[in-house]
Regions:
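N-terminal juxtamembrane/topogenic regions of multi-pass membrane proteins
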Residues: 1-16
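Amphipathic alpha-helical coiled-coil segments
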Residues: 12-29, 33-36, 40-57, 61, ...
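Long, charged all-alpha helical bundle/coiled-coil segments in cytosolic proteins
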Residues: 51-101
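Charged, well-structured binding/catalytic surfaces in domain cores that contact anionic ligands
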Residues: 83-143
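Acidic, proline/serine/threonine- and glycine-rich low-complexity intrinsically disordered segments
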Residues: 181-183
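Conserved small/polar residues in nucleotide/adenosyl-binding loops
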Residues: 185-191
Length: 195
């Protein structure tokens, strides 16, 4: 990225301010990147943990697969999922507060005995599935913010700060040359030939 500037004191002052601003902001942005990196790892680990727990729960009840055919799917429905927002390093992330289920009344005497257990199993599976999705979304949001922050750090470190320093150096050299012009008028002819 080429920095546009003019060879004058005003431009020199503006570039100096821009350089100082970026140099002051860089440590803050780096610490944000570090915090986001650790939060992404935590969210990824939590999502993986919920995924493993859900898989274990499914595996525990694989023996009931033949029974699920007679289970009435309308017995249980998710009524509400309560989410709140938590800011982590300036990024708004979802936090699961509560999952509310609606259980349709059923006759305990005419329905199979395991229906009550089936409703509990489905509640736990749904709860784990929703928690997994929330942590997965949290991880995606944090990872996106981390990538953007990393890009900004790289832009500042590798492009803008060196560019501003180079522009300031060029302006200073130009201004020094303007102030101290080289004059050959004081040299005599024999001196010029000796040089």
């Amino acid at each position: 990225m080429a920095i546009k500037f003019q060879y004058n004191k005003t431009s020199l002052g503006d570039l100096g301010k821009q350089l100082k601003m970026r140099q002051k902001a860089l440590p803050t942005i780096k610490s944000k990147e570090s915090a986001l990196r650790s939060e992404v790892k935590k969210a990824k680990d939590s999502a993986g943990d919920y995924r493993r727990r859900l898989d274990r729960l499914k595996a525990e009840y694989d023996y009931m697969v033949s029974l699920w055919g007679e289970f009435d799917c309308d017995l249980l429905r998710i009524a509400d999922v309560e989410l709140s927002v938590q800011k982590i390093a300036g990024v708004r992330t979802p936090v699961l507060q509560d999952v509310k289920f609606e259980v349709k009344p059923y006759d305990l005497f005419s329905s199979p005995v395991w229906f009550a257990d089936g409703v509990d199993i489905l509640k736990r599976m749904a709860q784990l599935g929703i928690e997994f999705e929330v942590y997965n979304r949290k991880m995606e949001l944090l990872d996106y913010a981390r990538r953007k922050t990393t890009q900004k750090v790289n832009l500042y470190e590798k492009v803008q700060i060196p560019g501003y320093e180079d522009a300031i150096r060029k302006i200073k050299r130009f201004m020094e040359d303007e102030e101290n012009p080289v004059s050959y008028t004081h040299l005599t002819l024999p001196t010029i030939l000796l040089v």
